[in-house]
Amino acid sequence: MRRINIILYFILISVGILAQNSKKIKGAGNNINAYIGTWVYQSNDTIFKIVFQKGKKISPYGETHGLYGGYYLSVKGEVLEDYMGPLPTCWNLEISTTHPDNMYIWAPNSDSYDKSTVPALGMSFYDKRKKHFNGEGISGGYIKLLSPKKLLWHLDEKKGIWWEVEGREDTDITKVLPIGFSVPEYAILTKEE
């Protein structure tokens, strides 16, 4: 009888351990360090800047590491957008599902890349003037390091709309019209020293 109790005890302990919600950590590593800093695009009288810093997003399923970013836009010497202030270091979805007010770009790192290479990163962009999907941001864009000093910035609104509404029964994708962006959709930026 004692042996049966010991066996049952170990079975219950094992089941309890296996039933624990193990949180996964995704995207951790230093392969995105090359993105950190301020990047500038200038064309005629337009200046567009973005800044990136490392951060993470915590959810009930785990934590995802990536880049938080801010942006700045001036045209003909007039500042139209200036969201380069302090950025968050953590977005905890267990506390609030609403994205932080000072988060304008979120580019999560992925585990599917070799950690020794710098990956292209998909991103969500929170356009403070156009407010896609009521300010919830729009995916479909990406950033890609072309060289240590050159960065490709690309926003694809049609793809972002598709990702947001595809499969939703409450929204007809043909009725969601593009509204554009307040910043350049495609630009090659240079890293500031």
Where are these regions (language model features)?
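Glycine-rich, aromatic-bearing surface loops/beta-hairpins
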Residues: 117-193
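Bacterial Sec-dependent N-terminal signal peptides
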Residues: 1-23
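Well-ordered beta-strand positions
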Residues: 40-42, 144
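Intrinsically disordered, low-complexity regions enriched in Ser/Pro/Gly/Gln/His and often acidic
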Residues: 1, 32, 155-156
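Extracellular structured ligand-interaction cores
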Residues: 36, 47, 66-68, 150, ...
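N-terminal helix-cap/turn-to-beta initiation motif at the start of protein domains
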Residues: 23-40
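Structured domain cores in non-transmembrane regions
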Residues: 45-136
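Short hydrophobic/aromatic-rich beta-strand segments that constitute the beta-sheet cores
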Residues: 41, 69, 152-155
